[in-house]
Amino acid sequence: RGGNIHNVISISPLTIENTEVILGSASVLYGSDAIGGVMNFYTKKARLSFDSNPHIELNINSRYSSASSEKMYHLDLNYGMKKIAFLSSFSKSDFGDLKMGINGPSDYLRPNYVTQNSNGEDILVINSNTRVQRNTGYDQINFLQKVIYEPNENLSIDLGIHFSETGNIPRYDRLIRGNQNQGLHYAE
């Protein structure tokens, strides 16, 4: 487990219906990785119709953010009848490099950034815009499909499929402090 763990971003925030945070040890219920607590995210459910008319919900969303040049598009559709319902959701996000606002403290300016040369070695490069954190951008797609079937009031069958794919998410946490005399060195 080296570097940042990005599991939580594999869920589109626009498909979340409810969130639960359990503080403290929850490893008995959720396994040894839950020793410090648990974050549960409950995604939207397919909704049945309660009368003879189909229950249809359509949500369309788009967003732009200047801090990361983020472009996000989202669509979800619920089609429910009395005994069976379908929910489909698709999200696409493109995140650019993070950019600090003009009123931010100068301590956070990035005069240099770390990249790799053709030999795979870390090198320090001069940043043309010190307000931009280079190599922090990535892209992502999310797909969610849910089906619910209730043949009678005593039986309910749910099926859920979730697919998420992210582009290369750079290791920004590994950012090494530069020393003008000695080059790069890792924090001790």
What are these language model-derived features?
Residues 60-66, 79, 88-94, 159-163:
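Transmembrane beta-barrel strands of outer-membrane/channel proteins
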